[in-house]
């Protein structure tokens, strides 16, 4: 159980803070606060809580969740809300934003490598190999120390990609996002992510989740080598924050003992140097930079937040297709490409070697396509390479009429044909799918 410090009885000796093994004890506005998400009762470090032992007045007491309303009297004015039409909002959609979204959603499934300094790096060539984008992950937004172990990448939360997209949307509201900041608080983020409807989650749990996701989205460092394109001169960016976490304001309420309870968070964030080249309105008019943006559906954020545990593959595909569909009405995406995005290269390799893994992956893939269809991302199958015989059953029965008489006629005609809707899949379906394509996906 976490501990808390009643400031009314605290003498301010500061003996406890250096003794805390998790760094949970913090000084906010000359008053002590123990972060309940970091405090673990010194379990795994010491047999007893060190703050209790170090305190001359035995002030620390067990923490209990705050009861009643969480109200913040004074807050800084935040940036205007996104999604003013209730449906969508412009967002920065440059290749650097797309690849960062891939990194946060696909994580260890991507081909990470070790650079010359021994740090983990995700690198992607651009413009037919003439340029490159490289990402490093730091231990925190406040640290410049890059991670060196893949285990750190595996701890990333796919939901951090939603925060990344929200930041990309806020960046489009500024004229010079690489110099200007936007301010967003936990109430706005709860609304965008659908967390305000989660009555099963306490305020403290929501604040902890939002803070962790913001920290992860702001832990990316990007380097870009971009070749000359027409009038646009080539440029190079080395080790720049993708999103700079300028400030985190914590809002507290105190009880009658002086115990501080975290009830709100406000974040000040600024886009990195990349925005000067990919989200520059004035320079775009002068044809010396890009201004690349797309449309972010609000429903995509809430859908990813609701399906990420049971259908991570579908969530990955939704985030990837958000950018892919921007490239044109017809994408002609191969099934292996979709599987690589949804499950990673290693799982596909296992499926190619093992029959049971192959069957399992096929079922998962077809179910994930159904989830996408249910949430408005409808797929158009290529009739040549992806005929009805190898399409998922849900896609084949979608044309069954709802009218009973018409449905009866449909089944009579189906039964008298050479192939039936309920026929089992042909032998070698996996090999057929490896050459199949989906012509397009629609965004919700």
Regions found by a protein language model. Name each.
Residues 19-20, 55:
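Cysteine-centered loop/knuckle micro-motif
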Residues 50-54:
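Short, disulfide-bonded extracellular cysteine-rich repeat modules
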Residues 1-12, 23-47, 59, 64:
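Ferredoxin-like iron-sulfur electron-transfer modules
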Residues 67-444:
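Charged, alpha-helix-forming regions
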Residues 15:
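Residue-level recognition of oxygen-bearing side chains
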């Amino acid at each position: 159980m976490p501990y808390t410090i009643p400031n009314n009885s605290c003498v301010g000796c500061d003996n406890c803070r250096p003794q805390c093994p998790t760094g949970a004890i913090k000084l906010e506005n000359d008053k002590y606060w123990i972060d309940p998400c970091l405090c673990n009762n010194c379990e795994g470090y010491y047999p007893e809580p060190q703050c209790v032992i170090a305190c001359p007045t035995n002030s620390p007491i067990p923490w209990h969740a705050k009861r009643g309303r969480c109200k913040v009297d004074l807050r800084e004015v935040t940036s205007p809300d996104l999604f003013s039409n209730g449906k969508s909002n412009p967002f920065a959609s440059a290749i650097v934003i797309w690849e960062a979204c891939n990194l946060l959603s696909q994580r260890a499934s991507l081909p990470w490598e070790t650079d010359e300094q021994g740090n983990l790096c995700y690198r992607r060539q651009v413009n037919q190999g003439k340029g490159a984008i490289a990402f490093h992950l730091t231990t925190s937004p406040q640290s410049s120390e890059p991670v060196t172990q893949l285990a750190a990448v595996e701890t990333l939360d796919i939901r951090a990609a939603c925060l990344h997209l929200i930041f990309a949307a806020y960046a489009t509201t500024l004229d010079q996002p690489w110099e200007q900041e936007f301010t967003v608080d936990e109430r706005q983020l709860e609304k965008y992510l659908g967390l305000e409807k989660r009555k099963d989650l306490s305020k403290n749990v929501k604040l902890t989740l939002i803070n962790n996701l913001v920290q992860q989205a702001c832990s990316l460092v990007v380097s870009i080598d971009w070749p000359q394109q027409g009038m646009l001169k080539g440029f190079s960016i080395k080790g720049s924050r993708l999103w700079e976490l300028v400030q985190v304001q914590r809002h507290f309420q105190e009880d009658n003992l002086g115990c501080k309870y975290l009830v709100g968070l406000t974040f000040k964030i600024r886009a990195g140097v990349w925005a000067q080249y990919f989200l520059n309105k004035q320079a775009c008019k002068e044809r010396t930079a890009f201004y690349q943006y797309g449309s972010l559906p609000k429903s995509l954020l809430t859908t990813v937040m609701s399906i990420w545990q049971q259908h991570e593959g579908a969530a990955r595909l939704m985030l990837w297709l958000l950018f892919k569909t921007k490239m044109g009405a017809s994408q002609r995406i191969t099934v292996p490409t979709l599987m690589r995005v949804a499950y990673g290269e290693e799982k596909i390799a296992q499926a190619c070697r093992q029959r049971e893994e192959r069957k399992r992956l096929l079922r998962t893939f077809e179910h994930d396509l159904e989830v996408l269809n249910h949430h408005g991302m409808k797929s158009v199958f290529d009739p040549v390479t992806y005929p009805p015989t190898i399409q998922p059953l849900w896609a084949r029965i979608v044309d069954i009429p709802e009218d009973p008489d018409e449905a009866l006629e449909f089944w009579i005609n189906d039964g008298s044909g050479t192939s039936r809707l309920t026929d089992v899949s042909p032998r070698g379906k996996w090999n057929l799918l490896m050459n199949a394509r989906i012509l397009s996906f629609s965004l919700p």
